[in-house]
Structure formats: C-alpha cells, structure tokens
C-alpha cells in the first residue's frame, strides 16, 4: 500500500513538473508575440492600468536615450570616441587647451600606470590634429625613461 502511494505521489510530481516547464515555454513564446504588457488583472492593487514589462528588445529607444543622457553626467564618458577604442577629438582639444586639466589627467594616468605605448594606442590615428602633440607632452611629463620613445606621425606598428 505504501509503495503504491509513493509511486503515485512520484508520478504526480513528475507530471506537474513536466506541465510547469511546458507552460513556461508556452508563456515565453506568448510574451514574445505580444506587445510586452502586463495584464491589468495581475496587478496587486487592482487598479486597472497598462504596465510594460522589461525586455532586452528596446521598442521605442526611449530607454536608450535615457541611458545616453545618464552617461553624459558621469565623468569620463566623452573621453572615448564613437569607435570605443580611441580618444575623442573634443577630449584631445580639451587636453591641449587647458593646462590644469591636462596636468590633472596626466597625474591620473601616471597613477594608473599608463605608459606612452598604451596612450599611443588610445590616441588612434596619429595623423589627426593634436594627437602627436598630446603624446609628446605626456612623454615629456613622464620624463626620460628607458624604452620611452617620442612619436613621429605614422601608423601604429
């Protein structure tokens, strides 16, 4: 008798787990086809409203615009160009135009062990205006060291 009850309980658990996983898959497909809204009856306070669920797909790009505005408030966001691998032209111009800002950044780079080679890679195309001058000023700021070479315009090797 106990054996039959145990087998029956195990069978019910397996059936319930299977149906739950199938319903989860069905629910995932259903939410992908809808406009990603939460049904009004599912709200805890029973106020009828349309609430949008979070998804990884941005439908109206409003959330991305908010994120971009937030990034502008954070320090150092305009340092990197659109390619994400080099300094922006505005940052290079600001570094060359503002002596106090340049010294502050150079000190910060020195604390983070940024050498001339790493800076040269961040400067990207050395033929662009001001990039060679900025690299030369940074290497002069560091002072004479073994292996530190001042740059002459040309491609990165």
Swiss-Prot record:
Induction: Expression is induced during host plant infection.
Annotated localization: Secreted; Host cytoplasm; Host nucleus
UniProt superkingdom: Eukaryota
Residue interval(s) of motif RxLR-dEER: 51-65
Record carries keyword Signal: yes
Pfam families named among the record's database cross-references: RXLR
Span of the signal peptide: 1-23
Keyword Signal carried by entry: yes
Keywords, comma-separated and alphabetical: Host cytoplasm, Host nucleus, Secreted, Signal, Virulence
GO CC list: extracellular region; host cell cytoplasm; host cell nucleus
Matches recorded under InterPro entries: RXLR
The record's note on its domains: The RxLR-dEER motif acts to carry the protein into the host cell cytoplasm through binding to cell surface phosphatidylinositol-3-phosphate.
Family according to the record: Belongs to the RxLR effector family.
Record function comment: Effector that might be involved in host plant infection.
Name of protein: RxLR effector protein PITG_04049
Organism listed in the record: Phytophthora infestans (strain T30-4) (Potato late blight agent)
